[in-house]
Amino acid sequence: SSAASDVYKRQVEGNRLLGRCRSRHVWNANESSGNFGALLLRDVRCIYGCHAAKCGFGTHVELLEMCELKAHREKVTDEELKSKLDEFHDKFNVEISCEPEELVRAARTSVALDRLVEIHQLGAMAYYYEGFRGNDYENIVTSVIAGNTLLTGYGIPVAGECEVKNAQAMKIMSLLKAGGSFSEFYAMDFNDDVVLLGHDGPAHFAIAEEKVKLVPLPLYHGKPGKGLSIQMSVKPGNITILSVCEGKNGIFLLAAEGEAVQGETLHIGNTNSRYRFPCGARRFMDQWSKAGPSHHCAIGIGHKVSELKKLAFLLDIPIVVVE
């Protein structure tokens, strides 16, 4: 019958999706998610334990040490450094205002991050570190954004502010071939009925309207130090935002479909874009917030709610869709 045929088609599509997820990083038994640095304690959204990650997705979270990253960084060769600088100029639109010393500092850290990912077989990572002002680790953590953006673009998403669950959301979007860029809500334009999202952390090349810019920031937003950051807008068209949430009954997914639209944004070294949702900006923000997510989310291109529902069913995780 037609109904039976539809059920069979959905099962086949679901099996393909699960197979795609299991064949890559998050559900691959040979790979882990990484967590290095420390929690951003002033943000309660970051209190999401490794146990929750394991129970929700079967993800092993490797606790990484800054001293290991420092050791890898000190062993970077001149050849590796030159190759990474060439990669920067190939993948990024490097602003002329970027100081050569900052490019070298970021490139050295990027090589060390690559090595960390390879050694620990990481499929995703979350990070944050402050420490005492002027320490060696601050020099490292203020130079990670370029390297983390490269990793994100290569399918190993990196979430800032140590939010493990957002790294998981980014990974899901990456596996769905939707990108998955680190972002957060920061403004609303009621006249244009849009919501603005952005972040100074890792971006994803696949969703950028133009080549991702590498720009200098004389002071990081709400964090110590200075260094390089990225600047981009999401290409106009259909988008999906996804958040992995933790409620009183455990892990659940929160998703919404909308549209990235053109318009004015702040040029401050962020992934700034404007988004319009069918229910309108006011109702969207009201319903999204009442679901109880953190203010971070993963942005991907295309409408992916149908696939996310199948994934949630196969993993036995609830999903809430804001429509």
Predicted regions and their residues:
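Gly/Ser/Thr-rich loops at beta-strand to alpha-helix junctions
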Residues: 1, 12, 37-46, 128-135, ...
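Structural alpha-beta junctions
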Residues: 2, 54-64, 178-179, 317-321
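Short, small-residue-biased leader/transition segments that mark boundaries at the very start
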Residues: 3-8
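A charged, amphipathic alpha-helical module
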Residues: 19-139
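Flexible, glycine/charged-enriched surface loops at secondary-structure junctions
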Residues: 64, 121, 128, 179-187, ...
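A short, gly/pro- and small-residue-rich
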Residues: 138-157
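C-terminal catalytic subdomain
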Residues: 152-267
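Extended hydrophobic packing segments that form well-structured cores
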Residues: 223-323
